[in-house]
Regions:
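Bacterial Sec-dependent N-terminal signal peptides
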Residues: 1-25
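Cross-family detector of peptidyl-prolyl cis-trans isomerase
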Residues: 18-307
Length: 307
């Protein structure tokens, strides 16, 4: 019993000492990046971008469950450089190769929210396009609103912006320390959160594949091999071959991934929503000379207004 009480006392002292170490910080999850130029204190957005924050934290603490075996069990960011620095724009790091093309061995989806690149000190994910996040991140020197909707903002500098502004190319990340203040931050399990993201993504992928398989089996096929299913029947007139029609669309890969859509709700459901583009029906002609994909035109000719 004395042993148990001693362990409990040690735990309480540890929690209190963590709180006293950074008394100026409000409750939340923080990352202190120690660089060759000084320290940068960042607050991470675990409520709005839990997956991106979990990725960063688990890499920093060395318990990310998805990293390439070469990085397994290692504090990923220690010793890496800021490989890309652009004056009056941003500093970028997190690439183990130092070239801008390296990563942890996996990619994950964007978490686009109302968080904006609205000033200096914004922490955001570098990427090579939609759904290509890995380990590379950048911190802004100034407002960069053209990046909104394209890069996931997941934190901000609360102390050390002068250090950010002083960073030069090839300066080093010495260490990244994660600081948990308050109950919610302490119970945020980054490794488990990130692992569960991939498990759920796999489950959704399997569900989509099964749904597509069922759809193929119930489809009606034309002589050309086009398969179609009318899920909702309208009461309008048939599509006329000599007229322009307005139509919504959603195009998928065979494995169930979304390629493109004109429907906002579908774009959001597949985490491909782009606030910079309109979501509205497109005009289409279905005659033989129209510059549309043949199968798309054939499918439209089988429909009526409202289908």
């Amino acid at each position: 019993m004395k042993k148990i009480n001693l362990l409990a006392l040690i735990f309480i002292i540890f929690i209190l000492s963590c709180g006293q170490q950074y008394p100026e910080l409000d409750n939340g999850l923080y990352a202190k990046i120690k660089t060759s130029r000084g320290d940068i204190m960042l607050q991470l957005e675990i409520d709005k971008t839990p997956i991106t924050a979990a990725n960063f934290v688990s890499l920093a603490e060395g318990n990310n469950p998805k990293v390439n075996t070469a990085f397994s069990g290692k504090k990923y960011y220690e010793g890496l450089i800021f490989h890309r620095v652009i004056k009056d724009f941003m500093i970028q790091g997190g690439d183990p190769t130092g070239t801008g093309s390296g990563g942890p061995g996996y990619q994950f989806d964007d978490e686009i929210t109302d968080l904006s690149h609205n000033g200096p000190g914004i922490l955001s994910m570098a990427n090579a396009g939609p759904r290509t996040n890995g380990s590379q991140f950048f911190i802004t020197h100034k407002e960069t609103p053209w990046l909104d909707g394209k890069h996931t903002v997941f934190g901000r500098v609360i102390e050390g912006q002068s250090v950010v502004d002083s960073i030069a190319q090839n300066d080093t990340i010495i260490a990244v320390h994660i600081i948990r203040k308050g109950k919610e931050a302490r119970k945020f399990d980054a490794a488990t959160t990130f692992e569960n993201y991939f498990l759920e993504k796999g489950r959704v992928k399997n569900d989509k594949r099964d749904a597509l398989s069922a759809l193929e089996q119930s489809a009606t096929y034309t002589e050309s091999g086009l398969g179609y299913v009318i899920t909702t029947e309208g009461d309008g007139e048939a599509v006329a071959i000599d007229k322009t029609v307005l139509t919504h669309y959603a195009v998928y890969f065979e494995d169930g991934r979304l390629l493109d859509t004109s429907i906002e709700d579908i774009a959001k459901a597949y985490k491909m929503y782009n606030s910079k583009r309109p979501y509205q029906p497109i005009p289409a002609r279905v005659d033989s000379d129209a510059g549309m994909i043949a199968g798309f035109k054939e499918g439209l000719r089988l429909l009526s207004v409202g289908d």
